[in-house]
């Protein structure tokens, strides 16, 4: 069968069951889609039509208009970056570091040196809104950088747009990206997280967010398509 176009859509973190190595990361019982379905009625007629919900039990449905399956990852690690690499044809044994107890002093000292700003936060927080509302007032008062991480291999830097302009925050994150490529740290992504608002009602600015990921270690499917004169957007 020949296709004229391929649309690749990624619903990041919408899993349909735990991976075989879930125990290694404390993710036993993970099933984002399944747990959502347990709690609420999803109105997703188009996704349902192509078998999205059928992936939960891999049951057959004659009304489904597409092929569906579950893929088992081979790449090491559990973060988004490794998963995206694998979807694009890169098999990698590289594992990016995670920092569940915060970042080592050496990283923080380096960030303070290259930015000239004090670091606050330095903890693992999976909800960015929580940490900006916890530390946002202090950031406003002192012009500090809120640095934190999540369960993934990332280093997130939050700052209020009225204190540190988005362009400046991006410059900081580019510099941080460079120093966190060291083997002993190897952070998968550095993420700029500007926010706006007033004390008690801070809001993340999605338009100013910018991710600085480690570049793919080799060519991807997209590169191969492009080199063979297929348009890639």
Write out the residue ranges for each language-model feature.
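A general structural signal for short secondary-structure junctions and capping/turn motifs
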Residues: 1, 75-79, 135-139, 178-182, ...
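Beta-strand elements within well-structured catalytic alpha/beta cores of enzymes
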Residues: 3-17, 87, 225
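Structural motif
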Residues: 7, 85-86, 144-146, 188-190, ...
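A broad, structural surface signal
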Residues: 8, 45, 109, 113, ...
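Active-site nucleophile/metal-coordination loop of metallo-enzymes that catalyze phosphate/sulfate
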Residues: 13-160, 164-167, 193, 201
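Extended, H/D-rich, highly charged conserved domains that either
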Residues: 159-160, 167-232
